[in-house]
Amino acid sequence: MSRDLQNHLLFETATEVANRVGGIYSVLKSKAPITVAQYKDHYHLIGPLNKATYQNEVDILDWKKPEAFSDEMRPVQHALQTMESRGVHFVYGRWLIEGAPKVILFDLDSVRGYSNEWKGDLWSLVGIPSPENDFETNDAILLGYTVAWFLGEVAHLDSQHAIVAHFHEWLAGVALPLCRKRRIDVVTIFTTHATLLGRYLCASGSFDFYNCLESVDVDHEAGRFGIYHRYCIERAAAHSADVFTTVSQITAFEAEHLLKRKPDGILPNGLNVIKFQAFHEFQNLHALKKEKINDFVRGHFHGCFDFDLDNTLYFFIAGRYEYKNKGADMFIEALARLNYRLKVSGSKKTVVAFIVMPAKNNSFTVEALKGQAEVRALENTVHEVTTSIGKRIFDHAIRYPHNGLTTELPTDLGELLKSSDKVMLKRRILALRRPEGQLPPIVTHNMVDDANDLILNKIRQVQLFNSPSDRVKMIFHPEFLNANNPILGLDYDEFVRGCHLGVFPSYYEPWGYTPAECTVMGVPSITTNVSGFGAYMEDLIETNQAKDYGIYIVDRRFKAPDESVEQLVDYMEEFVKKTRRQRINQRNRTERLSDLLDWKRMGLEYVKARQLALRRGYPDQFRELVGEELNDSNMDALAGGKKLKVARPLSVPGSPRDLRSNSTVYMTPGDLGTLQEVNNADDYFSLGVNPAADDDDDGPYADDS
């Protein structure tokens, strides 16, 4: 059957569509504007319905109205009608994000009656077991069968357009073997953002993951961790897809050995850089947000506030509470060693290190709330007193020439301060005192399991207790930040802007949005060569020059653990020793890397993946369309096997590599390669790309009534 490859339909499926759970939500949300600009109403996102949150995420549309769909998209409407007639419930609308993509959210409870039938069918088709009490897997099966049902209906009703179905992670991957087995006329892409087995092996802490991958007995290890059935779904999805991709080179290496299929290419995660852009204002924003953090620090350390905030640096680590995978253990150990170095050297600088990772807690401690309240009370009292003093000076000055007074303006504090002012101030100051021997707390919340918390126990082990002699102070904030926080009223993005350095020494990080977000906000960061972001930036910037751009890359792959910790300490100490002018210059260089992470650049890799899927699904049509025989062994080969080469920069510190240059041997990001902006529009054969998209002023609701 001949289908239109250029005007194909795109359906993207994930469990985090309009459902904030983890990083995939951020990927889909930030990528939506460029995808909608490219596909218009040919693009739909599909996911499960979260009844608790969907009303805040989706603008519901009346899909039954004839005008809800264009004539080209009428098969989607008919497919939904067919499924509704069979008892399937769903929500159809627009996701309330930039770009406003159309979404279909299936209510899995409405198809739960098919559960046993579908689980039995999955076993008979591909031999994947499904334990009764694994609710996450059961929901993955329900979603997979529902999506395959929907795609089958659309493919049957629409014989005109090619259909590309893109699935993210194993939770959305059950539909892939079903599409293959049922011979549904769609081409498929599967992207793994992290492998199941990889997460478990790294979190165990007893496995040299990256150097022993080739020797892993995957079936045995999956069984040992009790995830064999999930692993089978993930592996079946990888092998059933027309195109298999990962988010980074390091994850591609992992997937090749754990899922037993070499990925066809890399789909690195981008950012909507416009959201973060502040142009020349970003330095001012740093100063403003830093002052907010200063206010918190004054309250947190009240009674022991013996360090100069102008000589204080704010470091932080943030993310999910994965103690080893996110590198929290290494961060705390390195801070203890940094503290020792700074004390021995007699440094006057202080480092306040924040750990922002959600853990079970019972809200804020009374001490944390009281400290902020006492400092605010002192601030208000000082403001009242200074206002009164100003009024007295003004009254004296304005009477002076008329009453024949010969005395000068009062300068003695005793004359300016009334006794009542002194009493108020003394009360506020005494309220800031701590009981003798009591130190500022290291945690801001009442922890549910304080005695067994890994982060707190590590802090206790290295004895970073916020003593006056410590040059490194610790603050563990076991909740994500938001502007309504009563002690640190900043959103996460604002907090990042106010900090000086983000530290993310992850051991298992397929991509790593936290250092990427730091980069686009002009905040230097420390990452590792086993994180996708770290490896990506290592390839983009000349050897040993990444840190000049505020990207410090710790070697956690080829160095022993203790050597990696020492390297991290070296980087942090080097940063502490910088002057303010050096830090400002470095932030300027860091912010200039933003364009390297923009979806306008990264999104081209998604275009390549879709082309490769269409090439493999419709080889004859594709050859006829392109006019030549193309190699479809992987994404890079399909695009002509172009080498990405860059010239050695003439400036010092080196500039980011010019991806259009042709004079050296570097390729990005690594052996699997990407094209990014090297290719021109002709290289993409205009498959589904609307060249006028950037000039289109119509809003996302232009076709809605």
From Swiss-Prot:
Its EC number is 2.4.1.11. Alpha-D-glucose 6-phosphate binds at residues 280-281, 283, 286, 290, 500, 583, 587. UDP-alpha-D-glucose binds at residues 193, 199, 320, 509, 511-512. Pathway: Glycan biosynthesis; glycogen biosynthesis. UDP binds at residues 20, 320, 514. It holds the Pfam family Glycogen_syn. InterPro entries: Glycogen_synth (IPR008631). It is an enzyme of class 2 (transferase). GO terms for biological process: glycogen biosynthetic process. Allosteric activation by glucose-6-phosphate, and phosphorylation by a cAMP-dependent kinase. It is found in: Cytoplasm, Cytosol. The keyword Cytoplasm applies. It catalyses: [(1->4)-alpha-D-glucosyl](n) + UDP-alpha-D-glucose = [(1->4)-alpha-D-glucosyl](n+1) + UDP + H(+). Phosphorylated by the cyclin-CDK PCL10-PHO85. Phosphorylation causes inactivation of enzyme. Residues 693-705 have a biased composition (Acidic residues). Present with 14600 molecules/cell in log phase SD medium. Glycogen synthase participates in the glycogen biosynthetic process along with glycogenin and glycogen branching enzyme. Extends the primer composed of a few glucose units formed by glycogenin by adding new glucose units to it. In this context, glycogen synthase transfers the glycosyl residue from UDP-Glc to the non-reducing end of alpha-1,4-glucan. Interacts with PCL10. This is Glycogen [starch] synthase isoform 2. The lineage of its organism: Eukaryota, Fungi, Dikarya, Ascomycota, Saccharomycotina. The gene is GSY2.
